[in-house]
């Protein structure tokens, strides 16, 4: 019954966040949770010293491994963003499975709400609900949690968000070129999604 209830929850893609992630991905560089589009440069050794040549060869071997890892991460990111783009305008559902400990996991491995920061940020409930009386309070607490303050008191976390109202508005109005306060979060893309809800 529990798995059925979870499987009946419709999800959708958070289009504005997906647009920002795609923009950051196309820019390359060092955006959080997105691999660089550029490989490390590998240069051939041009000297005569055998020890230096061996050291240089080991360095190049490490760089080749790093480039292979980057290639794998780029393929993974491309796949996740492609899946998100394909489902951009649709509601969809996750089937779940339970492991031997009784923990439920979504079956799709690439894009799900237990995935990376980017995966979690681009997903949202397809049937939004009003925040209710305490909803804004809890959304602010959630933002503080995304900044790594989960062990502080609820009031401290709420106050953290209140004290950063100007930063929240700046990140909401110009996330890519403003002060980019959201990048300071432990989970920056989720923080940006939360900021967009607060904005």
Stretches found by the model and what they are:
Residues 1-199:
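Non-catalytic nucleic-acid-binding interfaces of large nucleic-acid enzymes and RNP effectors
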């Amino acid at each position: 019954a529990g798995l059925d209830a979870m499987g009946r929850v419709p999800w959708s893609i958070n289009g504005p966040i997906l647009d920002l992630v795609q923009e950051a991905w196309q820019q390359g560089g060092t955006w959080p949770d997105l691999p660089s589009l550029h490989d490390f440069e590998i240069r051939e050794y041009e000297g005569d010293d055998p020890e230096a040549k061996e050291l240089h060869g080991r360095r190049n071997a490490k760089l080749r491994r790093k480039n292979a890892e980057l290639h794998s991460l780029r393929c993974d990111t491309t796949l996740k963003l492609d899946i998100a783009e394909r489902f951009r305008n649709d509601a969809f559902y996750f089937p779940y499975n339970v492991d031997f400990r009784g923990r439920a996991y979504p079956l799709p491995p690439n894009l799900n709400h237990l995935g990376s920061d980017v995966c979690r940020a681009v997903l949202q409930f397809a049937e939004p609900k009003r925040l209710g009386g305490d909803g804004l309070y809890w959304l602010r607490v959630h933002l503080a949690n995304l900044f790594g303050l989960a062990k502080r008191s609820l009031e401290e976390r709420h106050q953290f968000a209140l004290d950063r109202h100007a930063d929240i508005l700046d990140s909401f109005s110009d996330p890519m070129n403003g002060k980019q306060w959201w990048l300071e979060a432990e989970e920056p893309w989720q923080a940006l999604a939360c900021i967009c809800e607060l904005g």
